Amino acid sequence: MRYKNIREGRFLSRPNRFIARVEIDGQEEICHVKNTGRCRELLVPGASVFLEKSDKKERKTAYDLIAVKKGNRLINMDSQIPNRVVEEWLRKGSLFGEGAYIRPETKYGNSRFDLYLEQGERKIFMEVKGVTLEEDGIARFPDAPTERGIKHIKELCQCIKEGYEAYIMFVIQMKDVKHFEPNKKTHEEFAKVLLEAEEAGVHVLAYDCFVKPDAILLGEPVEVKLI
């Protein structure tokens, strides 16, 4: 997945979840933040950020903030991109083989899962979660309590009972992490429900990403530690 019209800037502040103040070539700009999560460990004053300039003149903001540097690590923080990256990867035949039928945004029960797949007799639901939180080389999710995330996991368990396969894929939007684990400190219940889901047959996967200022590509599997 590639971006266009990338500019580097410097993060100044975040007045609310949706916008940030940045400096580009000495000029202050208001940009749209493509992640409504807290991201407090990423968006610190002075951090180098990468922005995509929009070609839509009617927009209120000219730029989208899509990536940030944390030390020497480049982290993509576009919360809309993990689904697209995984779908692109699956359509190349990864994980389930070539020729799979893939349908995004498919309703099941009271939820809408990110992907539904059919491969031969197999019927599969998949939920995708983007991960931007990294602490001491460990990738963690979530960075804030997520009742919606718990609901999705419980619905995946129901899928298993009804004969479907179920997957939850954590897309770590960076490279060079040691492993992935649920963020018990932030949301202990999410960690508990995720472990119970794996024990019930839900496949829990984590993959890192190759990240450049203008691109992101799904990388390699990362060890998942649930206990």
Language model region names:
Residues 9, 113-143, 156:
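Conserved catalytic cores of phosphodiester-cleaving nucleases, focusing on short active-site segments
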Residues 40, 72-102:
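Acidic-basic catalytic patches of nuclease active cores, encompassing PD-(D/E)XK
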Residues 45-56, 208:
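Flexible glycine-rich surface loops and low-complexity tracts that mediate binding to linear polymers
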Residues 173-227:
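Domain-level recognition of nuclease-like catalytic cores that cleave nucleotide substrates
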